[in-house]
Swiss-Prot record:
This is tRNA uridine 5-carboxymethylaminomethyl modification enzyme MnmG. Keywords: Cytoplasm, FAD, Flavoprotein, NAD, tRNA processing. The lineage of its organism: Bacteria, Bacillati, Bacillota, Bacilli, Lactobacillales. Belongs to the MnmG family. GO terms for molecular function: flavin adenine dinucleotide binding. The keyword tRNA processing applies. It comes from the Bacteria. It comes from Levilactobacillus brevis (strain ATCC 367 / BCRC 12310 / CIP 105137 / JCM 1170 / LMG 11437 / NCIMB 947 / NCTC 947). SMART domains: GIDA_assoc_3 (SM01228). NAD(+) binds at residues 281-295. NAD-binding protein involved in the addition of a carboxymethylaminomethyl (cmnm) group at the wobble position (U34) of certain tRNAs, forming tRNA-cmnm(5)s(2)U34. The gene is mnmG. InterPro entries: FAD/NAD-bd_sf, GIDA_C_N, MnmG, MnmG-rel, MnmG-rel_CS, MnmG_C, MnmG_C_subdom, MnmG_C_subdom_sf. It is found in: Cytoplasm.
């Protein structure tokens, strides 16, 4: 075969490899910060495509989308334009775990994001396959494509996803492929070990798609959207919300004993159990065959039938991810209530792909082996569109800052779920596809759906991703919120017959003395609208989102205060930096495991070091004393 001749392509400030959910956010962020940016993708028809579930959000993930929006990212705006159903989950639980979830029109989502990218002034979108990096003096200085183009840049982001040496598995069938039968990238990650990178092999899977015209909906349970408006973007008005007649329902059904018998009878053909699949799969999104084996005592498992869009009859069978042979998949489908006559349009499959071991990353998502190279998304070992988009935004911001010659940007665990995720990856690593859960966030009461803008919009404005106009609106909202909180902390409600009758009707003791309106609102049976029956309303009616923020701030004030005190302790630890050139071999007294882990992960602060598995408080005390004593000769 004739060798492809290389040629000099254009120079850019930032190059992003891969235009999935991570790459799209990375490229938009870098470009909006004023950098000439190139976004490379294997196929222009796969930009921000949803090869698995046609949805955005859910527990923890929905909050990440709000954080992306608060920082100036695109995912929230894009799904608000293209959803077919919206639901707020966990409404019966506390505010820390409430999460928005949207059913997406996957084709409209892709088209809208692609058009947004095409209209961005500093951003060039180009189809092509990146085979290798341009590396000089230990620094990444660009990329080389399969057509021979050498594009140089000040910073590069790799967001290759499951296309990175992807391999699809369906029963006994195996072939090289990216997601959804797209072309894979076979050389880029294969070249990374020569630059000092350690790679892992992960796998994920997807369920079969069925023809919606062949589903018996009357045998399933309807799951409609919400009547009350909700949005992912803080900029989307309530007037844009779709009423129920314009939303599409999902439908609930279940596996049964017959389904389980079919699966058990064919486990000898299941790649997951025959040793064919080598990659590690996601713990929190197991295949149906894995569920049947691991949870053998359960008589049934939930399945949600979800529309893939308005202009397609393909339906996604959520909960039925599988890599069983095609004929077995058909038998499984026909054993399920409502799917007895369902026509399978696409079989489910497993896909294996390359992952960069995340201990090789800094909190900015820059790689340790190569300066100026950043990675994001499934390349870093995560699962999920939202996790990918959050990392993409952070990597794009930092690639953009590097190109501008500015210091890096990080998010702490107390700032955002994005910060929790990145800290988990770089500090603890992951041996399986990482999924964000509310339980991973120790400060989840202050990392809520409702307050993402209060946490992050000022940072987004400082980075140049939030317009002055939007920032002014945010400051006005913040001022209104604070003014009403101050007012409620000044107004005193005095006891009278009306107020005491109300209090006693809820089984409470009558008021003896006056009580502040803020304190009265903390009572579990009092909401803001009820409070206004006993005090004057503010001069201007309040937006319902501000009312929600007021209620949460006051009702959970004690818990929030405790969380903020813990955050203050964390920040003191985060302020204790570990010198970059520290020599762990020279520190006496460290436990062997601690010594090995510290040397491998190279934490940047004592707080990060304290979160490493195998590093105990005694090791942190030794390390702290060593740094404070300023043993410069050994440190440097």
């Amino acid at each position: 075969m004739t060798e492809v001749k290389e040629y000099a392509g254009q120079d850019y400030d930032v190059i992003v490899v891969g235009a999935g959910h991570a790459g799209s956010e990375a490229a938009l962020a870098a470009a909006r910060m004023g950098n000439r940016t190139l976004l490379m993708t294997i196929n222009l028809d796969m930009v921000a495509f949803m090869p698995c579930n046609p949805s955005v959000g859910g527990p923890a993930k929905g909050i990440v989308v709000r954080e992306i929006d608060a920082l100036g990212g695109e995912m929230g705006r894009n799904i608000d334009k293209t959803y077919v159903q919206m639901r707020m989950l966990n409404t019966g639980k506390g505010p820390a775990v409430r999460a928005l979830r949207a059913q997406a029109d996957k084709h409209a989502y892709h088209a809208e994001m692609k058009h947004t990218i095409e209209r961005e002034p500093n951003l060039t979108l180009r189809q092509g396959i990146v085979d290798d990096l341009i590396v000089e003096d230990g620094e990444c200085q660009g990329v080389i494509t399969n057509t021979g183009a050498r594009y140089r840049a000040k910073a590069v982001v790799i967001a290759a996803g499951t296309a990175a040496r992807g391999k699809i598995i369906i029963g006994e069938l195996m072939y090289s492929s990216g997601p959804n039968n797209s072309q894979p990238a076979t050389k880029l990650t294969a070249n990374l070990p020569k630059y000092g990178f350690d790679l892992e092999r992960f796998k994920t899977g997807t369920p079969p798609r069925v023809d919606g015209n062949t589903i018996h909906y009357d045998e399933t349970e309807e799951q409609p959207g919400d009547v009350e408006p909700n949005h992912f973007s803080f900029t989307t008005p309530d007037s844009a919300y779709l009423d129920l007649k314009n939303q599409l329902s999902c439908w609930l059904t279940y596996t049964n004993e017959k389904t389980h018998e079919i699966i058990k009878a064919n486990l000898d053909r299941a790649p997951m159990f025959t040793g064919v699949i080598e990659g590690v799969g996601p713990r929190y999104c197991p295949s149906i065959e894995d569920k049947i084996v691991r949870f053998a005592d359960k008589p049934r498992h939930q399945l949600f039938l979800e529309p893939e869009g308005r202009k397609t009859d393909e339906w996604y069978v959520q909960g039925l991810s599988t890599s069983m042979p095609e004929e077995v998949q058909q038998k499984i489908l026909h054993s399920i209530k409502g799917l007895e006559d369902a026509q399978m349009m696409r079989p489910g499959y497993a896909i294996e792909y390359d992952v960069v071991s995340p201990y090789q990353l800094r909190p900015t998502l820059e790689t340790k082996p190569l300066k100026n190279l950043f990675t994001a998304g499934q390349t870093n070992g995560t699962s999920g569109y939202e996790e990918a988009a959050g990392q993409g935004l952070l990597a794009g911001i930092n690639a953009g800052l590097r190109a501008l010659g500015k210091p890096g940007f990080t998010l702490k665990r107390s700032d955002a779920y994005i910060g929790v995720m990145v800290d988990d990856l770089v500090t603890k690593g992951t041996k399986e596809p990482y999924r964000l859960l509310t339980s991973r966030a120790e400060y989840r009461l202050i990392l809520r759906h409702d307050n993402a803008d209060l946490r992050l919009t000022a940072k987004g404005h400082e980075l140049g991703l939030i317009s002055d106009e939007r920032y002014a609106d945010f400051l006005a909202k913040k001022a209104t919120l604070q003014a009403e909180l101050d007012r409620l902390n000044q107004i005193r409600i005095k006891p009278n017959d009306e107020i005491n009758a109300f209090v006693e009707s809820h089984g409470d003791k009558p008021l003896q003395d006056g009580v502040l309106a803020a304190a009265f609102l903390r009572r579990p049976y009092v909401d803001y609208q009820t409070l206004l029956q006993f005090i004057d309303a503010p001069e201007q009616p309040l937006d319902r989102h501000i009312i929600e923020e007021i209620e949460i701030s006051l009702k959970y004030a004690g818990y929030i205060k405790k969380a903020e005190e813990n955050v203050a302790k964390l920040k003191r630890m985060e302020a204790k930096a570990i010198p970059a050139q520290i020599d762990y071999d020279a520190i006496d007294g460290l436990a062997t495991e601690a010594h090995q882990k510290l040397k491998k992960i190279q934490p940047e602060t004592l707080a990060q070091a304290s979160r490493i598995s195998g590093v105990n408080p005694a090791d942190i005390a030794i390390l702290s004393v060593y740094i404070e004593q300023g043993k410069i000769a050994k440190v440097q």
